[in-house]
Every structure is written in structure tokens, then in C-alpha cells.
Amino acid sequence: LIEAFRQNQCTNRLISTLLRFFFYLLYGSMAWTYDWVAGFVSRGLWQEWVLEVAADLRGPKVLELGHGPGHLQKALFEKGIGICGIDSSRQMGRLAHKRLKTGGLEPNLVNGFAQHLPFASGSFAQVVATFPTEYIVDAGTLAEVRRVLDRAGELVVMPVAWITGKRLLERAAAYLFHVTGQAPEWDDRALDPVRETGFKVEIERRKLKSSELLIIHARKI
């Protein structure tokens, strides 16, 4: 039994290492495949999930952390919201820039890290992140987010989604999400660093047709 447990731990570490390398490529040299891969593993729901958050953003100025290929950027531009974006991936920056320019929009994108936001204090009413990695609860990130938010500012995060549909392809997608660690069981303790930084946290589970989203609203106190 102990040996089986150890083998399982080794397997999980190997899978985790391989996934980290895969995502490193996906945000780097293979960024051009991001939309296809995200759409495939989510059964085409990925963009719908990202755009669902647009309803929670009122502006007038919003900063998106990890803007990726720019789908939310475009949606907020079209809503008339003043939107900025920052991403550590230059490749993602190029994809988002092209998407916005093609739509006749003027990008306001920065290459950089959430722990060092190049914006003045109190610049934004809201900061948003969809499917961020663990950087979102880093002490440096949270301190910077709090700094750039105005006095009544809010951090909006969608960290995870679950595919709940019962059709064969939906069940297969849910399984793929589970084994790749993209749909973990939620543990509210993950938000302790957010609360400790001076935010009041509200958690919403939003049910869609064949999926469920976890959306976090964290307001400055």
C-alpha cells in the first residue's frame, strides 16, 4: 500500500511537471495555439466563460491581469469601458494587439508582471483576472492590486470553471479538465491571503447551461 502511494505521488509530480512545461510553451512559443487548445479542452466554452465576466465589470477604468489573447479586452472596449491589460508573455501581447487592431481598436497593453504594476495609485475602479495561476494570491500581486485600485475599488477573479453537462462529450471534457488540474475542488482557504491584504471577499457560483463558474468579488475595506 505504501509503495502504491509513493508511485501515485511520483506519477502526480510527473504529470504536474509536464503540465507546467506545456503551459510554459502555450504562453510562449506556442501561444498561437492557445485559443484552439483552450477551446478543445473546454468543449468550446472557454471564450464564453471569459466573456461572462464582462457583465461584472462596470468601469470606468479596468485593468486586466494576464490579458492573454485579448478576448475580454475587446469585449470591454466595445462596452465603452476604459480597459488596460498587462501580461508577462510577449507572445500573448502580440496576439491581443493584433486582435484589437483588427477590430479597429487602439490597444492599451503592457508587458510586465502583476507584482510590479506600472500604474499610478488609485488608477482603476476594478482589476480583473480570468483563470490566473497562483500569482494572483502572491503577496506582491495583492499589494499592487490594492495600490492601483481607487478607494472603492474591487478585484474580480474567475479562478475556476466546472463542466456540468451530462452529454458524452461534456463528460469527456469534464474528465480532461479534472485530470489536467483545471477544475479542482474549491477550497475557500485559498482566499485567506486576499482577506489578509484588506479585502472583503464575496464568492459566487454562477450556473450556466452546461457549466458552473466561480467568480470572486474582493472589495477594498
For the regions a protein language model found, what residue spans apply to each?
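A short acidic, Gly/Pro-enriched loop at the edge of an enzyme's catalytic core
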Residues: 115-126
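Conserved class I S-adenosyl-L-methionine
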Residues: 5-57, 71, 170-173, 177
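Core SAM-dependent methyltransferase catalytic element
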Residues: 203-221
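Conserved beta-strand signature within the Rossmann-like core of class I S-adenosyl-L-methionine
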Residues: 152-159
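Class I SAM-dependent methyltransferase SAM/SAH-binding core
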Residues: 63-65, 69-116
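A short SAM/SAH-binding and catalytic strip from SAM-dependent methyltransferases
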Residues: 126-137
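Short alpha-helix
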Residues: 182-197
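A short glycine-rich, Lys/Arg-flanked "PGG" loop and its adjoining helix->strand segment in the class I
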Residues: 140-151
